[in-house]
Amino acid sequence: ALNLYQAGAAKKILITGDHGQIQYDEIKAMRQWLLKHGVSAQVIYADHAGFSTYDSAYRAEAIFSVQRAIVVTQPYHLPRALYDCQSRGIEVWGVGAAGNAYSGQTARNLREYLARTKEVAWVVSGQKPTYLGPKISLDGPASATDG
């Protein structure tokens, strides 16, 4: 995401993740990393209720009115993220995040298979995300999403 932003491919960054508990905050880690690498807080928007990839894609369209996006995530996770965004009518491109190799990839692959099956069922059934809420404009201040 940082490289795409620095290259001018994206003017704003929507970070999305689980922040359902005070002691568990995926958003904080992502925001701090982006800030540390020179991204202005004014372009970092946060969705604190991205409890699943499905929730993140659904909320990106329903809450933040995203119509076009570049999704950056782990390569093994990218097909599901693209599917979820496309199911919401988002014109989407995907980029596999560069990163370290971690042990346990076999277990993550199994989890990914199960998650894909679940999310296809959610798309077909019209499942709502865990939380919806009022619209948030990506043309407004990013600080409105600080949570």
Which residues make up each language-model segment?
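A structural signal for short, hydrophobic/glycine-enriched beta-strand patches
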Residues: 1-110
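A general structural signal for short secondary-structure boundary/capping elements
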Residues: 93, 115-122, 138-144
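A transmembrane-helix-recognition feature enriched in membrane-embedded lipid enzymes
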Residues: 109-131
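Short linear elements at protein peripheries
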Residues: 127-147
